[in-house]
């Protein structure tokens, strides 16, 4: 049947100047493939990150690992691949991250750690997630963390580059990095940023795991009052070599207070835009809670 309409037809609104009126997020270009290879990324890391960005969860895979052990890998593996998680479930029944999540906290503190008597205190910021972003302050605030620029604005920071020259060699480069860290803290640095953004410009990259371990050990040096320099500062790892949850947990276990995985952030934005980065943060938060749940918690 026919329906006769009366009255003027509603006209479509005129298009907005410069576009269709529908705001579409422009995704940045992916980082160069050579940069990914230099930091040890492979196809598995790419597929893993895609799952995080699209679903906000870690991918589900089969049990077991059928790849070569790190010591037998013909390619140069990152240091974290030589380490595996030790599961120590001592509760019966096993504690459940999904239903007993209130037992787990991913909070961390940036800044000086005061002594029990109050001496040596300074500015301290609590992060609900030990992941610092390069940009997007609103997204960082939504996850209870900070951007790198906010860290630099709120604290006295010192940036150290984990690299060595061919002439000096790895051991001498590590020794120099340790000395630079000690000097920076003695001069008042509240946050040490180990950044490999410029690591391949005129030098050879030092694996950030090795750099964190060396700096953390060097800062155990005590001052005139007998207090370790480590209490005066926090370690923030700004690295392109952070590829997955295991890398994040590995660096935190070595002594870092927070991690800024800049290459992972760039790749997530290139894949799914801002939504993809939010998915990565959510997945890493869940993953860290899962790691904590297997460390051995008992009443």
Q: Which residues make up each language-model segment?
A:
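Phosphate/diphosphate-binding loops
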Residues: 1-2, 214-298
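Hydrophobic residues within beta-strands of alpha/beta enzymes
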Residues: 192-193, 259
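Glycine-rich, proline-tolerant flexible connector loops at the mouths of alpha/beta enzymes
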Residues: 194-210
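Flexible loop/turn segments at secondary-structure boundaries
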Residues: 90, 105-116, 166-169, 199-204, ...
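Active-site-adjacent structural elements in folded domains
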Residues: 175-180, 199-203, 236
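Extended, highly charged accessory segments
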Residues: 1-177, 182-186, 193
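Glycine- and other small-residue-rich loops at beta-strand/loop junctions that grip anionic moieties
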Residues: 72, 197, 204, 237-241, ...
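Structural motif
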Residues: 187-188, 254
């Amino acid at each position: 049947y026919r329906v006769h309409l009366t009255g003027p037809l509603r006209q479509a609104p005129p298009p907005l100047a410069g576009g269709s009126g529908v705001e579409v997020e422009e995704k940045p270009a992916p980082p160069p493939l050579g940069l990914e290879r230099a930091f040890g990324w492979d196809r598995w890391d790419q597929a893993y990150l895609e799952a995080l960005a699209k679903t906000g969860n870690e991918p589900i895979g089969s049990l077991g690992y059928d790849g070569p052990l790190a010591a037998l890998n013909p390619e140069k593996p990152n240091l974290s691949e030589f380490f595996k998680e030790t599961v120590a479930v001592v509760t019966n029944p096993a504690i459940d991250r999904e239903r007993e999540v209130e037992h787990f906290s991913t909070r961390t503190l940036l800044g000086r750690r005061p002594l029990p008597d109050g001496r040596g205190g300074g500015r301290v910021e609590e992060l609900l997630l030990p992941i610092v972003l390069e940009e997007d302050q609103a997204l960082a605030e939504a996850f209870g963390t900070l951007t790198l620029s906010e860290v630099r604005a709120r604290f006295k920071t010192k940036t150290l580059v984990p690299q060595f020259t061919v002439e000096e060699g790895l051991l001498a480069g590590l020794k120099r990095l340790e000395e630079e860290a000690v000097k920076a803290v003695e001069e008042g640095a509240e946050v040490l940023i180990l950044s490999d953004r410029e690591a391949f410009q005129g030098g050879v990259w030092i694996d950030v795991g090795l750099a964190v371990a060396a700096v953390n050990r060097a800062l155990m040096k005590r001052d005139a009052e007998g207090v370790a320099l480590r209490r005066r500062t926090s370690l923030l790892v700004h690295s392109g070599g952070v590829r997955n949850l295991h890398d994040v947990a590995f660096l935190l276990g070595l002594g870092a207070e927070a991690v800024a995985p800049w290459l992972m952030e760039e790749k997530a934005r290139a894949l799914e835009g801002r939504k993809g980065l939010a998915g990565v943060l959510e997945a890493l938060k869940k993953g860290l809670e899962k790691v904590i749940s297997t460390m051995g918690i008992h009443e």
